[in-house]
Design a protein with these regions (language model features):
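Structural signature of FAD isoalloxazine-binding scaffolds in flavoprotein oxidoreductases
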Residues: 54
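Catalytic core of pol beta-like nucleotidyltransferases
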Residues: 1-32, 40-46, 57-103
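Conserved histidines in hydrophobic membrane contexts and catalytic metal-binding motifs
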Residues: 35
Length: 103
């Protein structure tokens, strides 16, 4: 589990497992892994999930994204949400991009 000793996911905990996370991402055609949401801004609690933003290789599908989520949840022992980097410039997409920090 990614934790600081209290069961709270942290950016530092994720970065300690960076190589493992990037290896899993690459298996599913994902790169440029970034963290956003409560973990990125330091507001996570014991019930928080991990929100990741990724770039997917051309030709990859929702099945690749689903496989990535399942493999990361198994490795990290916590619910993980993964979004592909939005191509459109909506207000929500811009907020996520601003908040996202490199793994």
């Amino acid at each position: 589990m990614v934790a600081t000793g209290t069961g709270v996911p942290s950016l530092e905990g994720l970065r300690a497992r960076r190589d493992e996370i990037l290896r899993i991402a690459a298996l599913h055609g994902a790169s440029n892994v970034r963290v956003f949401g409560s973990v990125a801004v330091g507001y996570a609690d014991a019930g928080s999930d991990i929100d990741l933003l990724v770039d997917l290789e051309p030709g990859r599908t929702v099945l690749d994204l689903s496989g990535l989520i399942l493999d990361l949840e198994e490795a990290l022992g916590r619910k993980v949400d993964v979004l592909e980097t939005p191509r459109r410039r909506t207000r929500v997409a811009m907020q996520i991009r601003r908040e996202a920090v490199p793994l």
